[in-house]
């Protein structure tokens, strides 16, 4: 439940609140982005969905189990991903997308270490810029990873990847993930849930 509702012709950041399931309120920073938001990713909360696939090389392995733990929204919709790779191995969950060369694309997702031994380990996200990886250092709390890249080709795969040769932590890593989003924008925009099609809100 919002404290207030209003409209304006620009963007701003303000403090909002929402009701907690066990009573009371939690407060958070919210951005009142004016305009439609299109999440280009499909199955933004289900990484077993048909538009996501595994990409493996060398000794890489990946396992995805859906709806295993509470999401940042306090619903049982976050997935568990287990990846294992060493050396030149690659273990990734990917989705193929179209893009316009030179345009910015912003990607975001929520991550959390699944086990105590995974806290502090690093996984990677590769977005629209080929060869550019963003580090995600896992915590025992939900953290949102945000990044913006310019597209280097007319198509790319968004990779949630374990690739030690590019800086992820060698060996097995298990983490929770929820709320992946890609927008054709120069900044990360408010989250929009998707299923089997891109959604605009």
Region spans (language model):
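Glycine- and acidic residue-enriched flexible segments with recurrent GG/GxG motifs
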Residues: 1-201
């Amino acid at each position: 439940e919002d404290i207030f509702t209003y409209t304006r012709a620009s963007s701003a950041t303000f403090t909002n609140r929402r009701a907690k399931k066990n009573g009371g309120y939690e407060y958070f920073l919210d951005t009142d982005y004016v305009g439609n938001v299109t999440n280009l990713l499909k199955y933004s909360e289900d990484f077993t969905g048909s538009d996501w696939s595994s990409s493996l090389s060398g000794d890489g392995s990946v396992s995805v189990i859906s709806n295993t733990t509470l999401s940042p929204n306090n619903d049982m919709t976050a997935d568990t991903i287990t990846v294992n790779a060493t050396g030149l191995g690659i273990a990734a969950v990917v989705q193929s997308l179209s893009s316009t060369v030179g345009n910015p694309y912003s990607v975001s997702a929520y991550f959390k270490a699944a086990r105590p031994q995974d806290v502090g380990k690093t996984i990677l996200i590769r977005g629209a810029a080929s060869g550019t990886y963003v580090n995600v250092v896992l915590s025992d709390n939900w953290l949102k990873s945000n990044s913006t890249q310019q597209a280097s080709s007319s198509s790319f795969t968004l990779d949630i990847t374990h690739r030690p040769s590019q800086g992820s932590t060698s060996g097995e890593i298990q983490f929770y993930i929820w709320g992946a989003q890609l927008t054709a924008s120069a900044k990360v925009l408010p989250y929009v849930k998707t299923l089997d099609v891109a959604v605009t809100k």
